[in-house]
Design a protein with these regions (language model features):
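Surface-exposed, charge/polar-rich loops and edge strands
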Residues: 1-392
Length: 392
């Protein structure tokens, strides 16, 4: 299985794709992220080749449909990058209904872009298959579903894979009454999309295109209890470039004084202390060799990432929503020290450093019908693609 599964399609670099292709002729990357060619036509392209590839695997017995309904407990054992803590995130893979947001069952927390949806729609139209799970959160503070998953995990897993990041993925199966018990416990749960907004909205559009196609109203999902101790969100820091050098950083720091208390700090420890204290919005700024702490003068309980986008990037630096969307001045980076190093080496004019948002903040925003700025959440680790495939 380790030679067949991949990271999610939007996390696969060209180098990773090359490595996946070398591992096995049956690696899923051939379906979810094929290589375009200079001679591609409407009759021969990445999407037609993906469809042909999947059909060949099914016809040749490489892939076989599981005839017994069930759900698949899916545990991920990992090391939290920022703390070094060893954790297990527990969830299960199953089919979930594709519901309009207006129904109040499935909730989003991000806006989507048209480009990724167009690409995934073409793949879905050609393959009629969902090859990657959507990552969904559900509320279960009592842990009733987790208890059933724990019981199933006492047996040997059906599959165990260690990925390139050292994450160990294990999958089991629950059938019969056990699966029905989980269905019953999940029947009234609201769902929050953690990862996979573009693919969820692609599935919505595909359902609309194919009202008579059996199974088009469902998609494969991994469900994780939002109260699970293994659920982690990492911060995604903002790297800024292409600002007018004649007024940066001096002009920016002076202007920021009207909105924030701007304090030079000696180390990241002071920033982490401000985050731990749980006071007003505290944003770090690494500019060259200097570090600054920006504390909101008039905190209103807004998310730090929203304050950064609206009042720092937008108001003070003139990087509006369209520029953010087009990434004209902005790059994103995981890892506090790595982001600071970008500023210190001059690879970025500034690195703005954010405290990770909490699951509670994401849920409160989403269930209230709101959305967060792009790349506000980085749920870690990512779900492995290729563990299950849902063929319509």
């Amino acid at each position: 299985m380790g030679n067949l599964a991949t990271q999610p399609y939007d996390k696969i670099t060209p180098a990773m794709r090359t490595r996946y292709l070398s591992l096995s002729p049956y690696n899923l990357v051939r379906v979810i992220l094929g290589e375009p060619g200079p001679a591609d036509t409407s009759a021969d392209n990445v999407y037609t080749r993906a469809s042909d590839c999947l059909a060949e695997w099914i016809d040749g017995g490489i892939l076989a449909r599981d005839r017994e309904p069930g759900v698949f407990p899916y545990f991920q054992e990992f090391t939290e990058p920022d703390t070094g803590e060893r954790l297990v995130r527990k969830g299960f893979i199953a089919l979930g209904g594709v519901e309009d947001y207006s129904a109040g069952i499935v909730h989003r927390h991000e806006q989507t872009l048209s480009g990724p949806k167009k690409d995934r729609m073409e793949l879905l139209r050609h393959t009629h298959a969902h090859c990657e799970q959507l990552f969904m959160l559900y509320p279960d503070p009592a842990g009733a579903v987790d208890a059933l998953l724990d019981a199933a995990s006492a047996a040997a897993p059906l599959a165990e894979v260690e990925d390139e990041y050292g994450v160990i993925h294990r999958v089991w199966k629950i059938a019969g009454d056990g699966a029905r018990n989980i269905q019953a416990l999940m029947a009234d749960k609201k769902l929050l999309i953690a990862d996979g907004h573009h693919r969820y909205e692609t599935a919505l559009a595909f359902r609309g295109e194919n009202p008579g196609l059996e199974g088009a109203d469902r998609v494969v999902m991994t469900f994780v209890n939002m109260h699970s101790p293994g659920l982690r969100i990492l911060a995604t820091h903002r790297l800024v470039n292409n600002l007018a050098a004649d007024d940066f950083p001096g002009g920016f720091l002076r202007a920021a004084q009207s909105e924030f208390r701007v304090q030079p700090i000696e180390s990241l420890r002071r920033l982490k202390q401000a985050w731990t204290a749980g006071g007003p919005t505290a944003i770090g700024a690494a500019i060259g060799q200097a570090l600054y702490l920006l504390e909101d003068r008039q905190p209103a309980g807004e998310l730090d990432v929203r304050v950064l986008h609206e009042r720092v990037l937008g108001k003070l630096l003139g990087i509006g929503a369209e520029a953010v969307r087009d990434e004209k001045h902005l790059r994103y980076m995981r890892g506090l020290e790595a982001a600071v190093e970008q500023a210190r080496t001059g690879a970025a004019q500034a690195a703005f450093l954010l405290k990770p948002v909490s699951v509670e903040q994401v849920a409160a925003t989403s269930f209230a019908g709101g959305v967060m700025p792009q790349k506000s959440t980085d749920f870690y680790p990512k779900l492995l693609s290729g563990l299950t495939i849902y063929k319509l």
